Design a protein with these regions (language model features):
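A glycosyltransferase accessory/donor-loop signature
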Residues: 6-7, 20-23, 172-178, 190-321
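Short, flexible, basic/aromatic active-site loop/helix in glycosyltransferases
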Residues: 160-177
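GT-A fold catalytic core of metal-dependent nucleotide-sugar glycosyltransferases
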Residues: 69, 99-153, 188
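Short, charged/polar "capping" segments at the starts of alpha-helices
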Residues: 14-17, 45-55, 151-152
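Extreme N-terminal starter segment of soluble prokaryotic enzymes
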Residues: 1-4
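Active-site-proximal specificity loops/subdomain of glycosyltransferases
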Residues: 48-110
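Short, acidic, metal-binding catalytic loop of nucleotide-sugar glycosyltransferases
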Residues: 24-35
Length: 321
């Protein structure tokens, strides 16, 4: 039986995560009912559970098939037990490292070849058949950020130092326009981890990243370029390594149909984005067949247009809010 592996770290079992998992499960099953879908999710903040979230947790447990749940301790123990390395304090300082460790586990222990990383703040706006066919054929799937080509480049100099100028040459051959790729939705060839399975090479992988908090020593949140570097390390690892070391030629999705943008700035095709319009600037983002409501936006929390779309989906599928 063919299978699709979907994995990520999500905040908690709540309405948003139920929507995300149900949406992609339903899209795939409507196209290919005989495909096995496996979800591997690290639930990061279980202390957020309450009576409302308890309802969504029960729905996740009943409606989402083949769901494998993890917590941070599982992967801390994975690193300790298999590699005799204690990085727990570093991991707590920079939690996005779990995005790197989780697929390593899926490759090394579960022996999977490919997975789709999928955030819980994504709308799938078409029938998804094009994407599913690529995933089933284990072709890396890359969606670009046309307004931020540097979104996945913070590690490029480190990786060139490690692998030599051949790394840059291979990257240029497969991504000649140096597009930047979003890691909230990406089909990843897990063979990129094969060079990091031994203890010394796994430690080498962990030491590739800077373990910095998004808060300074006074407890103030860091912004600007320093925050950008902290936040995009894992995205850079996936975007660069997946392009260079995937066994199959990656599919860079057509930027006219698939793109990830914030709710401000100037889109190269659609022009200036007005974040004070009726969609709070997300009207252009909604033109993409995959809309990712990325974090660097005006305003706190997820935008109203996304939350409304979630509610519309749930009601349409007969789930009470």
């Amino acid at each position: 039986m063919k299978e699709i592996i979907i994995a990520n770290m999500m905040r908690t079992k709540n309405k948003q995560s139920f929507f995300a998992l149900h949406q992609i499960q339903s899209k795939i099953q409507s196209l290919y009912s005989d495909i096995k879908i496996e979800f591997h999710i690290l639930w990061d903040n279980k202390d957020e559970y309450n009576d409302i979230n308890d309802k969504w947790e029960k729905l996740i447990n009943s409606e989402i098939k083949n769901l494998y749940s993890y917590d941070r301790k599982f992967f801390v123990d994975y690193v300790k037990n298999l590699y005799d390395l204690d990085y727990e304090n570093k991991f707590n300082t920079w939690p996005p490292i779990y995005h790197i460790i989780m697929p390593h586990y899926i490759r090394r222990v579960l022996c999977k070849d490919y997975y789709l990383i999928y955030d819980d703040d994504i709308l799938i706006n078409d029938n998804f058949d094009h994407i599913v066919k690529l995933v089933l054929n284990k072709i890396p799937v890359l969606i670009s950020e046309p307004m931020n080509t540097n979104c996945d480049k913070v590690l490029i100099n480190k990786l060139i130092d490690i692998f030599g100028e051949g790394f840059l040459t291979a990257y240029k051959n497969r991504n000649p326009e140096f597009k930047g790729f979003n890691a909230g939705f990406q089909g990843i060839d897990l063979s990129i981890y094969d060079d990091f399975l031994s203890k010394d090479r796994f430690k080498f992988l962990l030491d590739l990243f800077e373990y910095k908090s998004i808060f300074d020593q006074n407890g103030n949140e860091i912004w600007g370029n320093e925050r950008f570097i902290i936040d995009t390390q894992q995205q850079s690892f996936f975007g660069l390594m997946n392009v260079v070391f995937s066994k199959k030629e990656p599919c860079i999705l057509d930027e006219n149909e698939y793109f990830v943008v914030p709710n401000w700035g100037v889109h190269p095709k659609f022009g200036e984005i007005n974040h004070e319009d009726e969609n709070n600037g997300w009207g252009i983002g909604l033109k993409s067949k995959i809309t990712h409501f990325i974090g660097h936006t005006h305003g706190k929390g997820k935008p109203k247009v996304f939350l409304n779309k979630v509610d519309e989906y749930l009601l349409k599928n007969n789930f009470e809010l």
